[in-house]
Amino acid sequence: MREIITLSFGQTAGHINADYFNSQEHYFPLATKSTSDPTVRFRRGVATDSRTETYNPRLLTWELKGGYGAFQAFNQFYTEGDKSQPQVWNEGEIKEIKEQPVDKNEYQKALDLGRENASQLNTDTTKRWTDYNRLFHHPKTRHQLDNWLFDPDTAPQGIHRGGDQKWTGFDVGVNEWEHVLNSDKEYLDSTLRSWVEECDSLGGLNVVVDDSAWAGVAAKILANYRDDFDAKGTVVTWSVEAKPEKKTRETQKNAIQTTVALSQVSSIYIPVSFPTKTPIDADFDPTSPWHQAALFGLSVYEPVQLMATQRTGGLSLDAMAALLDTTGERNIVSEVGGTLTDVDGDKSTVQYDSRLFQELFLPSRIPPKTPHVFSDLSIARLEDQDDDANSYRLNQPMPEVSSQPEFTKQFVSSKTRLAVTTKPRRTLLDMAKFVSVYERGDEREEMKQELGDMASKYEHGWEEESDDDDDY
């Protein structure tokens, strides 16, 4: 068995993973009919009654204070002081965090009674991912930064509890991580290490983060993981860019720091942008994180995740990384998309290509060329696969869970594609120019050189040497 542990940082990541793990619950009753092995993503456990077998996601979540909403660390299967699995959790007592309670929505109340109803969910009642989470989590999956507050209405970006500083910017996350380590030198030993060591054969880490201050936290945790636990293990990182905002020097600097730091600690780095317009029908609301996560899950995220859990004909995380990064030096995925087919045979294509590769940092007189594709991966779910070596077929049926929006019910099959292309080259060179023009300090020259070296890995053909309007 090649277990996969998912690390989820913040609300955007929480929505994506709540949708995914809810969907996986649908496959449990299918038993032998399911093509997916649940033990890759779920861990077996025993409830406090010493009789009931439980399955908990191999998932670690990080949130700001208030981010968990009504989601409780302890539940009917795990109570405070639970020592039912001492062979796994041997890093001290579980700490319960007290905070102002948030009332459960009607869907969660109905779930507690075993009477959930999809009509109880809408875009107003799903502002936190915990509003529609269906699964019990082990108490040690949950981690919280108490110095920062989240509220979907009054502080959607997150705010420092001592003032007006927002939870934005790579450096803000780095500073908070240093504060965490200063308070607890063994933080990673008591969080991530326990999960890694319980695995029979760790298949890798699946990481989801956005480009807020969480990027700084995630980059530091992964760097420490590389240094202390597993220097060569597979790490696949999905980085979701925030909603479009006015381009400033700060947002550009943040994009540079996020791209460099996360790509360096990842085997495969997949930056994505959620679309503001899609061909999906009017029931889809692009402003709803619940809707965006469900659409992304159906078209891209779940098919990719399912490949690593297939009993036969699948693709492990390390095999996927080797397929996409054929040289060991080009690990940035720059084309991400999916096509969904509905019951009438109509197709809707949604692209998640990062805005990094669509909007130049600095003005250029030369229009972008058609990108060269170095490698790609395509997954056909209940459809005919493409006729090439990097195409895979997925026979797992589409999920049917009450927690998903109504618009998802129309789709019966999908095709997903990830590709490594020449697109990052131009963006990385633009980043180097930005550093040259605007940055000062001792790290300026080192950062320029680093970005230039990264860009050179995405060159293709003799013409690449002359398509820049000036040197960086």
Curated annotation (Swiss-Prot):
Q: Does the keyword Mitochondrion apply?
A: yes
Top-level taxon of origin: Eukaryota
Q: Which GO terms describe its cellular component?
A: cytoplasm; mitochondrion
Which InterPro entries does the record cross-reference, listed alphabetically? DML1/Misato, DML1/Misato_tubulin, Misato_II_tubulin-like, Tubulin/FtsZ_GTPase_sf
Q: Where is this region: Disordered?
A: 441-472
Q: Which UniProt keywords apply?
A: Mitochondrion
Q: Which Pfam families match?
A: Misat_Tub_SegII, Tubulin_3
Segments of skewed composition (Basic and acidic residues): 441-463
Record's subcellular location: Mitochondrion
Q: What does this protein do?
A: Involved in the partitioning of the mitochondrial organelle and mitochondrial DNA (mtDNA) inheritance.
Q: Which family does it belong to?
A: Belongs to the misato family.
Name by which UniProt lists this protein: Protein DML1
From the broadest rank down, the organism's phylogenetic lineage runs: Eukaryota, Fungi, Dikarya, Ascomycota, Saccharomycotina
